[in-house]
């Protein structure tokens, strides 16, 4: 999608957010090569993982992360409980947080 956006002439910022599951330092280089300007790290990463990933961040690629908010019991974008139970897709920003129900 990033390459298609650039090929279509889009010149704005291209961000890969938490649902891209960029959990390995090498994934940042791939994101940069694909044309990303910013990567938003998954919430599930430990502080040590964030340090390791940020140390490998290529020049010109911005890193961002959330430090507050709901923490999913699954890796971001990998859970289908909400969609299966309620038809609401977490991948479309509409998670019902069904995993938190009693």
Protein language model features and the residues they cover:
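Active-site pocket-lining/capping segments in soluble small-molecule metabolic enzymes
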Residues: 1-22, 40-102
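Conserved nucleotide-cofactor-binding alpha/beta core module
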Residues: 24-26
């Amino acid at each position: 999608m990033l390459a298609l956006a650039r090929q279509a002439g889009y010149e704005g910022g291209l961000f890969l957010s938490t649902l891209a599951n960029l959990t390995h330092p090498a994934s940042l280089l791939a994101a940069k090569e694909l044309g990303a300007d910013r990567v938003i790290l998954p919430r599930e990463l430990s502080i040590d993982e964030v340090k390791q990933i940020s140390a490998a961040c290529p020049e010109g690629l911005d890193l961002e992360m959330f430090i507050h908010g709901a923490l999913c019991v699954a890796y971001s974008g990998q859970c289908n409980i909400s969609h299966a139970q309620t038809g609401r897709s977490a991948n479309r920003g509409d998670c019902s947080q069904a995993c938190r129900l009693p």
